[in-house]
Amino acid sequence: MNDDEPQGRELNRRELLGTVGAAGALALGGSALAQPAGLAAPISAASPASHSAAAAPKPFELEELSVRDLSAGMAAGRWTSRRLVELYLGRIAEVDRAGAAGAGTNAIAETNPQVMEIADGLDRERAAGKLRGPLHGIPIVLKDNIDTGDRMKTTAGSLALGESVAAKDAYLVERLRAAGAVILGKTNLSEWANFRSTRSTSGWSGRGGQVRNPYVLDRNPCGSSSGTGSGISGNLAAAGIGTETAGSILCPASMCGLV
């Protein structure tokens, strides 16, 4: 990992959230399932002068909610899996894709084109009294070096693998689907999990560009699981998967306020 940081005007998370709306780690083999660490909810601040006319966003309905909270809410009929997916996709569009001054967190490489179909199927199973497991209907994101045997790409952030579609799910993904998880999308990362060079920038890849720290957008998100750390800290999914070699989960978790 490298301490190089994207340059430019300092733009912090409060400015982003004021303009556009604004993990615990559970080891799963060589990966981790991250959830928000229970930090205080972000406070919106005045937007930059160039965006002074922008309306303040509504509070995000799922702000800092845990997998347990969301599961209990679905069991009580407060949400469906489809509704959770809709809310997180809206959050991604608002905070990750656009962002203040055209710069969002850039944590998500790709969303799953089949995600609504998957969520609807899991909702039908719930209505029929069939629950696959503790993650039934929960939207989760995966680092873009983890194979999914679907229509999403698995590229390790490299343009060389830009059209690479895996033939089958990684074992980890098989287990997640068996437990009922909804694979919402893939997260950006340090290209080749930070094996691109000895002087690479944390969170940058040819495919995804630069991931930004959700607390201070021009600061280092660390890596190589940068998009997962930034995305879960920014409440872009209920939980996320990263991979660890030498700090690739621990460092983004530290920089982005996850445990």
Across the structure, where does each feature detected by a protein language model lie?
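Residue-level signal for the nucleotide or nucleotide-sugar donor/cofactor binding architecture
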Residues: 11, 65, 226
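Aromatic-acidic/polar surface patches that form glycan- and anion
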Residues: 9, 63, 221
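Short, well-ordered alpha-helical
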Residues: 15, 19-162, 192-194
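Generic anion/oxyanion-binding catalytic loop in active/binding sites
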Residues: 5-6, 59, 73, 220
